[in-house]
């Protein structure tokens, strides 16, 4: 535990030294979606996805026009939505241990029940490269990479060996190089593409985050923070939305800001 604390403090010091605080070009509102939603997501093509109170997934274009919708009452409440691959949207229903994969029109491509394997207890899912999936198995306290046919390709070490406790996963996200695991009420753990533990990032108290071009973006009050896990640089950008912000999602050129009754689409282009 002492070694972990020292590493985390060193990471924090590096961030303080390299924190550039770069002021980006001023963001402007380019569209508004007058729909109440529980969550918002943006892919790298700047498509916007809203999760409604009825567990319906709505897909909009960058101008805020509704294009497609998807709902599924068979598996209960959606635990997570991963739109990092616009052609392969991954939905995870934790209560039923079920994953559903959609195409860009939000039609089902495939689905899989983790309950088929009695040894698994999946608490988080992320989309990987080459149609793979990363999952966190609470039963073995490990990250597992599954192939497109849902067979095991990679398995990390038991994280109990590192943290002396069972890791309580809240969310996972994957980039080309890394996998990030957010612990409930704690920070974000970084792993390499083989499931090897890299470090605990010096950012905590996150309600949500997303990955864009290997950069972690998260909300801090009315500011959008972008953290570069390879250079330790961090930048801050104020979101020009007067209403209380519950979530922000970053795409290629679009930032979607979720408020109680609407979603504001911002851009600096």
Where are these regions (language model features)?
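A short beta-strand motif characteristic of beta-propeller blades
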Residues: 26-33, 65-71, 108-115, 152-164, ...
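Repeated scaffold domains used in trafficking and secretory/extracellular systems
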Residues: 35-43, 75-83, 119-126, 164-173, ...
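Conserved beta-propeller blade signature
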Residues: 47-50, 88-91, 132-135, 178-181, ...
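Short loop/turn segments that connect beta-strands within beta-propeller blades
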Residues: 61-65, 103-107, 147-150, 192-196, ...
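Beta-strand-rich domains and repeat architectures in extracellular enzymes and scaffolds
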Residues: 31-54
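WD40 beta-propeller blade core
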Residues: 58, 98-100, 142-144, 189-190, ...
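Blade-level signature of beta-propeller repeat domains, shared across WD40, Kelch, NHL, RCC1
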Residues: 246-269
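Bacterial Sec-dependent N-terminal signal peptides
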Residues: 1-29, 269
